[in-house]
Amino acid sequence: MRRAIEWRRVQTPLRGVLLTGALAAALLLAPSTVRSDPAAPAPVASLTGVVRDDGSKALPGVTVELRLAPGVALTAFTDTAGRYSFVNVPAGGVELAFRVPGFATLVRKNVLLSAGTTTASDATLHLTTSADVVVTGKRTFHNLADLDTPVDDLIGIASASTVGVVTAQQVDERETHRPADVLESVPGFLVSQHSGEGKANQYYLRGFNLDHGTDVATTVAGVPVNMPTHAHGQGYSDSNFLIPELVSGIQYKKGPYYADEGDFSAAGAVNVNYVNALDAPIADLSLGNDGYRRGLFAGSTAFAGGTLLGALELYRNDGPWTSPDDYRKINGVGRWSTGDQANGFSVIAVAYQGVWNSTDQIPQRAVDEGLIGRFDAVDPTDGGRSHRYSLSAQWESTGYNSQTRVEAYVIDYALDLWNDFTCFLRDPVHGDQFAQVDRRVVTGFQASRQWLLTLFGRDVEARAGFQLRNDNIPTLALDDTKARDVLSTVIDDHVSQTSGALYGQASIQVAPKLRAIVGVRGDLYHFDVQSNVPENSGRDTPGIFSPKLSLVFGPFSNTELYLNGGTGFHSNDGRGATLTVDPTTLEPLEKVKPLVRAKGAEVGVRSTNLRGFQTTLAVWLLDLDSELVFSGDAGDTEPSRASRRVGFEWANYWSVNRWLTLDADLAYSRARFTQYDPVGDHIPGAIEGVASAGLSVNDRSGFFGSLRYRYFGPRALIEDNSVRSTASTEVNLRAGYRLTKDLHVTLDVFNLFNQQSSDIDYYYTSRLPGEPLDGVADVHFHPVDKRSFRGSLAYSF
């Protein structure tokens, strides 16, 4: 039976909080029905409605405010069916506000309540970009351009123009040559490779050659991918375990403006979500040239009061190389989940194993002189093997005006990697091949809580949380090798690295057209290094404090303006914090600063003024106290001088009609060292201009496909800018047809015009047999794959 509670109008925020708490306790399982004081003057009216999420599911626990005048409001809560109601309230024009943590606040102005009648006002709330929630369907995010009204996109949700989401549909429409290509759906993000396919990719964003992930933080299904203090390179981010068909959505944010983002996020952070359930079981078989074969089997079913998802991927590919990659991997995902966006629990297990040979970057002079071909290897015994096993759990609970989220994870990780970048420079007899070995167990825990408050008559969404991570690395080794046989051990370290963080953030509606987001973050690290070179053993416990501030103006005609500023950081290899001597020569060395400050600022605009069309523009600046740059001699990244980057990004997405979408992104940056050195101030490998454009077709008659263009601009390869890489372009094609409702075929063509360009270029010294002992400085490149074809047949049961 519906219950009614009589109460007086709320005049102050404190009284509103007290009455809200009392009402929440009384109406836990029933819809809220609010009556005015019996003495309130006529005329009166009633209001009722249902609140749902953008997947049409009822949202319980939503705070519904009926604002009669400034500082005068009635409050109700939705029940388990998402219903709310107000009875016998003053008639006339009112304002309605719907608020719940994890979803964008919806405000409706000038709602007319006619005397003696009941007005219905339903509402749909949309997930905020920070809500990595438990979902039960394929889509975490709708295609934003397809939503009913322009206000239903990121206007009113995002805190910067370079915050965004990528939908599952957008991921599905893209051809993926390798798993990490999914990340190229983020505007301005590029992916390449300088070695074998099983190795972590090269990433580029905001003027950075990020190597394997130095300044972009990546998570998949809530579990971090970046590896600090890694055998091959700081922040190593291997995403070969990613299965594109399971992606439910991607959230991205760029710049150091977000309190919940810590290490490696100075340039940006990308969170890839996985589905909890599939609409139907699928079997997808793919074949292509160069020995490409792939099978994917996935499905979900009801189990033990929840949903059980399972997926298995089998993969093999040789690539266009004279010495075949022979990359073989097996990849499995299992997930059990229960609940919904507001209250849910999920456990996910991921298991990945890969083994491969690799053709590393090769000297340009060796190709020019006819010693080797573009797809030949200097050392055909290079390669690697890796595994990643992870188990994680996520729990989320939403109460009245609050939301709590808890996550825990454990990762068992291993890598054996053999590379030879300098040929015969260090060892003219045996060659310069070296092995990098990494064995670690990663454990982590994080929790956060959000509150909806009213402070001095202003709506406030507050968030606080902490994060804890430990990397126990019993083996962190560097060996000199020949044909993968160990000749000598250079480094054999045991490192325990622990990091903890506390953060807080508040989003305050300062004025009707002004929102302020204030955040602070504190990080504390502990490095414990036990080295085979005793002088390099030791401990260090550094910390860093990072304030953030964003201002959002608008919306004005479905347009918002953003001002963002903040500080962040990236960590350096923990062994640098205790380093005192060179492990080979024992010559004295200076310790490396373990935590490097980043300072950033941004001005941006977002507009959805035209139906179906979204555009964002940002001008940004980012300073680093120390740059991480690639070292050809060491084959990894090393700390260097302080730097500054300035640039702009322009991203556009247009849903032309129900079957055609267009997108185009353009980014440019200028990167320079800010500390003087006579060798020059250009940052080697720093990306300048990038662009991408595409069209996607999804016709009801059964045809679907996409055509995509990518431009990778030239880059300085040496500090004085005397040697530069050439620009490259690539066009990829996808074409498919639905033979039946459950069966479709797809053809992907990569490098459609068979461009002979480089995936990456470096400039450093190497030595081929017969050359001077001090070597030859030269461009070293890894070519883009030749034109290749992949066909797939997919069936949904």
Predicted features, each with a name:
Residues 152-155, 160-164, 177-227:
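Extracytoplasmic beta-strand/coil segments of soluble accessory domains associated
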Residues 289-316, 321-359, 382-403, 451, ...:
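Transmembrane beta-barrel wall of Gram-negative outer-membrane proteins
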Residues 394-398, 403-422, 554, 560-570, ...:
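Membrane-embedded beta-barrel scaffold of Gram-negative outer-membrane proteins
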Residues 448-452, 512, 516, 614-625, ...:
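Gram-negative outer-membrane beta-barrel transporters
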Residues 52-57, 63-67, 99-101, 114-172, ...:
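Short, acidic, small-residue-rich periplasmic hinge/interaction motif at the N-terminus
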Residues 714-715, 737-797:
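C-terminal beta-signal and adjacent terminal beta-strands/loops
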Residues 223-254, 272-273, 365, 592, ...:
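Short acidic/polar hinge/loop motifs at secondary-structure boundaries
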Residues 344-352, 384-532, 609, 613-619, ...:
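Face-selective signature of the C-terminal outer-membrane beta-barrel domain
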